Amino acid sequence: WTDKVNVDFSTGDTNIDNYLKWICFQPVLRRIYGCSFLPYHDYGKGGRGWRDLWQDCLALLIMEPSVVRQMIVDNYGGVRMDGTNATIIGSRQGEFIADRNNITRVWMDHAFWPFVTTKLYLDQTGDLDILLEKVTYFKDLQTKRGTAHDNNWDHAYGNKQRTAGGNIYFGTILEHILLQNLCAFYDVGEHNEMRLHGADWNDALDMAWEKGESVAFTCAYAGNLKDIADCLKHMEEKTGISKIEMAEEMKCLLAEGTELYESPDRKQKLLDEYTSLCEHNVKGGMILVSTEQIRKNLVEKAEWLMQHIREKEWISAGDDMGWFNGYYDNHGNAVEYSKKDEVRMMLTGQVFAVMSKTAGEEQVKEICRSADKFLFDQKAGGYRLNTDFKEEKFDLGRMFGFAYGEKENGAVFSHMTVMYANALYQRGFIREGHKVLQTLLEAAMNFENSKMYPGLPEYFDNEGRGLYAYLTGAASWYMLTMITEVFGVKGDLGDLVIAPSLLPEQFDEKGSAGLKLEFARKKFEIIMHNPCLLYTSPSPRDSTSS
């Protein structure tokens, strides 16, 4: 186990350094015990979920990068041609099982995570060739993004998408990525935000199938579209590849123009036309599209989404505070607001608005002030997932059946809290990001209160007790944030970049802080020296501090 956890931090506080070892170990334990037979798991029968596949890879990219390439390739085999994915994961790598439910549940965030992991892999390794690896698509009874059945499918057909000629269809990983994110772009509700379907990252937002919308993940997908466009640009520059092969059915997904973007009805119609084309078999024909055309198309779509959200979803609360509405409920009403006698605010929408750069710099400042006022609770371990709605809001989700401060209803949910920190660091809000990470760490390390194994729990309750030790992906994100943002050691298409965001208190008495890790199959010990500690508090714009 000591060999397995090959990351070491030196921050001047040995208690924190040792505890970070346990957090780095936790993703290994999560793969073994998360969603398992143990009473700590929360739910499940021992299998892994779709998000687990991709978030486990995040930690492995740091600790065991050699095994990750094939995992990523195999995981893309769970994607359907309609942009959704298998939800029952087999015991073998790359094995996906048909869901026998009448209408399978669709989590609208699922298509977001694969590219997040793939992008980190590309940055860590520079292996752009993986994007051109050909992979199958998953096929079962479910079609049209969980709203219909393919009555021509049976078990004899198998669980791999076929062509009209009966052959198994293979598409590049890049095609899978484009398909996932473009289908999401068109799958919108009446407010032109992406439909919530059966839930997003918050599994307990599960009662707004008809009219629910997730502004939070509309932000997230907008960020993905821009990052995919950047990826295409780098691929053309480094490999000379200027044209991409894709299924001929996908041509309609590259439609463009403001008139289309501003019409939810036209978007839904286009998506229906596309999903009808691949409802049973695909033709098997391919088209060639220039990378420049696709890149411009993605950027145009991303910028439209971001501007739409800035114009329609921003809530001004006065006193230099404000945040984005993150959701619409099943009656089509905005979930978050600021009224004279009541405030409703949720963390998830702010995380992805900040991370995707949908939020401008002044808006990030206002979000930080609002989160500190309405969501921060030191006793409970940090930033709550939402304010107290004081109602059983079952036109949005089961989360409102939990007591406030339990599980998804306003608990300090470690995973989203760490992602909030990560987003703040990415935007240069170092002191604010540090507060998020440090408060969470202190809550976990206070064993009299947290009453848990070393690591990060799924969430902390009102009293600061940590619950469900191995379910969460928070440990992977905490380790990733410490390495790539706090210490600033990260890859850039295979090149090593060091741009630390350490605060004075994170150096030892000699003015040093250090990190041991593997990169590009080599072992590094990186020491950052700041003997003068030249300043005491970085401005929000600072990206380095040593």
Language-model-derived ranges and their functions:
Residues 49-67, 76-78, 168-179, 208-227, ...:
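Active-site core of glycosidic bond-cleaving carbohydrate-active enzymes
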